[in-house]
């Protein structure tokens, strides 16, 4: 049975072109870029070239604004904690209730350390209120950290507007966006619409580079203290020997993503939309989370009422289909998704969510297979539910109401 991988918001297959670009730096040009001999200077040039290419793809004014890290979690920690250390006289942070744990938990840690953190709510579609955002800005606000696209629902926040409103209110406020899910999928122009963004995080393994490499954009003039201290690497902003093969792979992956982005975006959106329509037509009592909000072209998050998501995922896996119930970083937890709770998803559905996320390697045949098996999986699980009337194929009266208090 062929595996159908539909969990690309969790991680992606390394592109063959990326793998090929990395190979020489494992066994031939394996030198430390900080060393002084000629071969090492060659690997230093590889890092410099990767930095230039990534800066160009993102519209950064200066390659030195690109800081290489090990992952988006490190990039987010560096951005948030680095900004906090560099601006000790300001103690207020603004974020949202639906951030990835790599941002949310850092903000909660700052809160425990005495910072005042505002967690902005979202509406039932996952949208932020611009007026509520502006009201949250204060004279002591040091940082705004708002994701570009949500990893669970795919809902896209208006970072262009949010960053502009921030700078119009107070140019000294640092604006950070976690663009892990959007870089390579959506346009990101740090010299254009994103020109008010000071810090931007992303990760290689979400755009067909390997796990273990990420980057942080740091706009010139942004006050930020280093998160990792030691050597002089990365302009003394991030200590540690550069991971040359992975950095080369990251640059190649971003090149590929941007070269094919518009065509990939259109084709992948068609796959997503086709699956969405089939699910809505074939499964009763299902809702598409974020359906009417701007969304990533590859992401579909559905909640099936009166079904446990864990059961759906196990049965999908038995059919060779890889999907998710939310962030892979918290998938070991039995707690319901904080993102769906923030959207106000009903009790009967919040535990029954499944996320399908596609990439350039998915096909019409993949979607055909999911459409064939997923409705039947939901139907089979509902037969076991005390809240579902199997004869009428509808919820029982007052289904689930007695369990809301638990």
Per-range role (PLM):
Residues 1-406:
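Pyridoxal 5′-phosphate
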């Amino acid at each position: 049975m062929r595996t159908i991988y539909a969990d690309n918001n969790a991680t992606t297959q390394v592109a063959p072109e990326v793998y090929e670009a990395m190979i020489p730096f494992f066994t031939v040009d394996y030198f430390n870029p900080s060393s002084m001999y000629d071969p090492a200077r060659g690997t230093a040039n590889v890092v410099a070239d990767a930095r230039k290419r990534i800066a160009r793809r993102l519209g950064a004014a200066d390659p030195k604004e690109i800081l290489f890290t090990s992952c988006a979690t490190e990039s987010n920690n560096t951005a948030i904690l680095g900004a906090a250390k560099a601006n000790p006289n300001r103690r207020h942070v603004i974020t949202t209730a639906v951030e990835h744990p790599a941002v949310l938990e850092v903000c909660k840690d700052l809160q425990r350390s005495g910072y005042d953190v505002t967690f902005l709510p979202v509406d039932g579609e996952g949208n932020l209120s611009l007026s509520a955002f502006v009201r949250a800005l204060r004279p002591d606000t040091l940082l705004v950290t708002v994701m570009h696209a949500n990893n669970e629902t795919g809902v896209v926040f208006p970072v262009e507007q949010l960053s502009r409103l921030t700078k119009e209110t107070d140019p000294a406020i640092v604006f950070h966006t976690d663009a892990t899910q959007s870089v390579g999928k959506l346009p990101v122009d740090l010299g254009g619409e994103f020109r008010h963004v000071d810090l931007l995080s992303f990760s290689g393994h979400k755009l067909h580079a390997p796990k273990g490499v990420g980057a942080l954009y740091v706009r010139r003039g942004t006050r930020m203290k280093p998160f990792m201290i030691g050597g002089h690497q990365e302009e003394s902003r991030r200590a540690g020997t550069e991971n040359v093969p992975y950095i080369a792979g990251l640059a190649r992956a971003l090149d590929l993503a941007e070269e094919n982005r518009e065509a990939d975006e259109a084709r992948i959106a068609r796959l997503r939309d086709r699956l969405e329509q089939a699910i809505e037509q074939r499964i009763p009592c299902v809702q598409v989370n974020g359906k009417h909000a701007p969304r990533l072209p590859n992401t579909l998050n559905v909640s099936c009422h009166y079904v446990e998501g864990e059961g759906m995922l196990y049965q999908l896996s038995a059919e060779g289909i890889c999907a998710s119930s939310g962030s892979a970083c918290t998938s070991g937890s039995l707690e319901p998704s904080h993102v769906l709770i923030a959207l106000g998803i009903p009790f009967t559905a919040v535990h029954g969510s499944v996320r399908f996320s596609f990439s350039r390697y998915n096909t019409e045949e993949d979607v055909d297979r999911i459409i064939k098996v997923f409705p039947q999986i939901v139907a089979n699980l509902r037969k076991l539910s005390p809240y579902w009337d199997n004869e009428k194929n509808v919820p029982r009266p007052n289904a689930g109401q007695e369990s809301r208090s638990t």
